[in-house]
Amino acid sequence: YIRFIKIMYFDKENPLSRSSSTNVSTAILGSSQIVAEKNGELLIGVDNLFLTEALHQITRGFVPGGMNKNPFRIGKLAKDRTKYVSLNNYPENTDLVVQYVYSNPVPTNWGSDKGLTDARSVNAVVQHSLIQMPENNFKPRYEDPRVGYFTTQVTDMTAADDPTPYRDMIHKWHLEKKNPSQERSEVVEPITWWIENTTPNELRDAVRDGVLAWNKAFEEAGFINAVDVKIQPDDADWDAGDIRYNVLRWASSPSPPFSGYGPSFVNPRTGQILGADIMLEYSSFTYRVKTEKIFETFSSDNMVRDEKSCQFSHVMQENNMFAMIASRSIGDFSPLEQHRIIYESLVDLSLHEIGHTLGLSHNFYASHLHTLNNIHDRHITEPIGLYSSVMDYTSANVGPDSKHHGQFYSTTPGPYDIWAIEYGYTPSLDNPEDEKERQEVLLSKSTKNEYGYGNDADDMRRAGKGIDPRVMLYDMSNDPMGYAQQRMDIIKSIFPSLLTRFEAPGESYHFFRSAFSILNRQYGSSARIISRFVGGVYMDRSMVGQKGKEDPFIPVPREEQKWAMTLLGKYLFSADAFDFSEEMYSHLQWQRRGWSGTKDPKIHDMVLNMQKGVLDQLLHQNVLKRISDTELYGNTYTLSQMMNDLTTACFSSDAGSNVTTMRINLQTEYTRRLISVVHNKGKSKYDHASVALSYENLNKIKKYASKVKSVNEATKAHRKHLIYIIDKALDT
């Protein structure tokens, strides 16, 4: 299966089509000799294609200056050990499975013991699929930026008057009505999913319910029973390699690179989806937590970076455990409640991954469907969904107390999902002008909140990425800051009784430590959600003249940005933000296994990494520049005010008293970051306003640090050190 990443279209009636290959570099990935030829058919040797990286590159180059100074390297391809594992011919596809062996005789990074037996030899098994392209009456549908589908990009090189000459085709299945004249009809051939016999029996009903729930959306597009589900018999005479079977598969890996993944195979000429499989990881529904790294994963450097893959279920395990911890601590945690958490999460995961295989991309705006008051009311959320699209990455929805426990996850396609399926799958009208008008009427609804859309290119998961705080991962409700504050208050209320609830006679403190970690990860995630409103810009992709449209860019109102800084000051930067008991700290012990690493909890590192994750955002060059830029079109929360508020949050509360060790870390970290801005070296390039205001705030810090009367020796030493590093930096 060879995908054409970019395609250029030339109208054959246009003389320019005669020069369609001019200034276009075509890649020659491999070559092979013709062994035999008969009646126009060729026999070639394929080893140069399939036993090398010609068709699929596995090794990656080393990036100089990267954060990881000693990255894991798989080595060079060992051609003498690389081999074919299997060759399977099916009626509509041929699969070649190749085991690539890489050799690194002297590795400096031995990797992880999770699935890697010896770093000197790494095996990668890759399946190459050759798929027969169909010949049918499938009609492509072209993308619109207001609704999110995966696409095959096509640029019209002969369109003279169109500023956006795009003919990008959305990816969709070929569905036909049995009775085309009826508004709603049974389908000729449904999209049939097979639940593989590897699926644990106790999970099959939830998976089935999640798949079949999509029929609700297809009915709005005119199709009845468009999606079907079957169970693979144990004695089935077919396997998942046959493209005629769309299979939901399960695995239980030691350290999976994904937890739920829904790839599909597409005809690059039309956008028709030819087949799909979904791989789900059982580890997402277990209590296995990587506690050896729980105190290292709060900064934005460790946020999910691969926007092209689906990592939804990676976080679902943590979300499920948080829901169980919270329910056990603030409500009546019964076996029925535990079942509901697992059931709803698995239905939601199935909906999400099936959505990808239907062609839908992520929609990280979708969590804004309900108000903060309604989000915990099952009677409101169950009929239409907890969020407007199951294609979002959300956290488990946990209420503030046992009386306000709504849905944990969504169990039905939301309003956006139904609208998107209606756009992509409703059969075209015979008259092109009528069809264009029909689509415009449907797309004109995009200004409504329930149809809001923002994908991976728009989201703010990483520091400095994106601009619209509504397009964020793991947030909830149309008041994300209010929900994040509520989440942090819930976590704070759980901590005092956490040890007594999670210690069991005869057991180690491993589960308690895991619970402590998960609560803090959720706490840090809430802080990052809040931080995105500072310097944020609300974005609207409505078309000119569309009813209900707003300006394309609207700065987040001043009062919202100020409130975000207030919340961060209280919940993240203040002296009592992490006021845990000594008893809790002294019991953070994981169960011994082997002898690697020190076992004492690195508490200061945990807290500082959480604070770093927010400072990464607030002091990112993109954010500081954007605050200055948005002052030109409506932002009244100036860069000067923001940086002054940040300095105040880090220094003012203990200006005349002793400074705790956690605040010493924070103040030193913040000071060093301002120094870095002033020096303005390396890859990050700050504008002059950011440099000047950083310089000004360093002088303010010197004034804070000059107060050394009536404080202990540690505080005196800390403040003298701040003055020293500031003077040294400004003198160079």
Roles of regions detected by a PLM:
Residues I231-S252, P257, E344-P400:
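The catalytic-center signature of Zn2+-dependent metalloproteases
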Residues Q272-T291, R305, S350, G355, ...:
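Extended catalytic-interface subdomain
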Residues E337, I341, S367-T732:
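Conserved catalytic/binding loops enriched for acidic/polar residues
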Residues Y1-T199, R208, K216-A217, A221, ...:
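Auxiliary tRNA-acceptor-end handling modules of aminoacyl-tRNA synthetases
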Residues V227:
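Conserved structured catalytic cores and adjacent interaction surfaces
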Residues I170, Y245, F258, P263, ...:
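Generic secondary-structure boundary/loop-capping signal
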Residues L203-G210, I342, L346, S350, ...:
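Stable alpha-helical elements in mature extracytoplasmic
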Residues L212-F223, S253, G355-H356, L360, ...:
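Sec-exported extracytoplasmic/periplasmic mature domains
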